[in-house]
Amino acid sequence: MATSMAQTIYVCKDGDYTTREIAEGLELSLTEGIDSITFRQPVMEKAVKITFQEDKASVVIPSFIEGVTCSSGTSSDVVLTSTNLTDEIIYRVSGSSRAGSLTINGDYKLTVALDGVSLTSAKGAPLNIQCGKRIAVVMADGSVNNFTDAAGGTNKACVYTKGHFEFSGAGTLNVTGNANHAIASKEYCQIKRSVKAVNILKAANDAIHCGQYFQMNGGEVNITSTTTNDAIQAEYELDDNDAIIQDPENTGGIVIKGGSVNILLANAEDAKGLKAEGNIDITGGTFIIDAVSNGTRGMQTDANMTISEADAPTTITVNAKGTKCTVAEDAADPHNCMGIKVDGNLTVNAGTVTVYNTGKKAKGIKVGGTYTLNGGTVNAVVDSAQ
């Protein structure tokens, strides 16, 4: 007998099973001593392929994928809608367009696989995921992926989802947010250990903005001086009545377990490098934050901060070079530049924290609650209430 396609077969001999890959068209014969041969159909990857070619894009939806349709306002603005609620579909994206975008609508978790894509949108977000579930963004090893939106747009971010982002893969993501945030998610945002780099080249608002929490397990995040508000901001997710949603994941916090974070706040008066409504928990990583603009703060939390080396060595360096904030909205609170501000308690268990407050009247560390040094080294003047 001949196989009609490449398959995996199970061969049973004397009660023991082994597997073999059989190429298409290969003749098989049942020889003496073989009890049976069982064919297993190959697993077909449920992937939609989107390839951008400047003013056009090709979309391939395999016939065995159910519930996915494509519509486009223009040939390079791709809109995909999925009604499939049982299968996690992969959207493989490559190519480039100087006037293109990808919008995905759906109600089930999905994966966006980036392999050297470069999109600039003249209308809104070049990557817009209208799905309130888990959105895995996987970058191919060694790939460089670029997204840029247009100034004056009404989109919430250059790279946006109404669900939660999980970035992974040993590639690079470059985001230029000319309209609003660079990256934003309504729910949490995670950067996995495998990520090579996330580079925010510009943000008209926050560089990375998320609800629920922000978590970084490794990789590298670089945020440049063209960000005009906070670098990384996590806030509580709210319901339609602006009340905090009661959910264990809705912590409003920042958790960083490793990797490197490099932030330059040189064009963002009153901005913060890390800003959390909830707790900031650092258990590993290397941080270099240059707070150059007036009134800037390297790190700020409305709650508590804990620093340790539970997951990796921790080194935090904040250069507080700015002076007093002068923007009109802060006239009632003309605060100075500061390295770290903790409204609650600050606990340092391990690691090295250094604040260089070289700006005029710049401050080191201010703690509204209790400051506890259990281990590690803190090279800064700490002003605590207790």
Task: Please tell me what each predicted stretch does.
Residues 42-386:
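A composition-driven surface/loop motif
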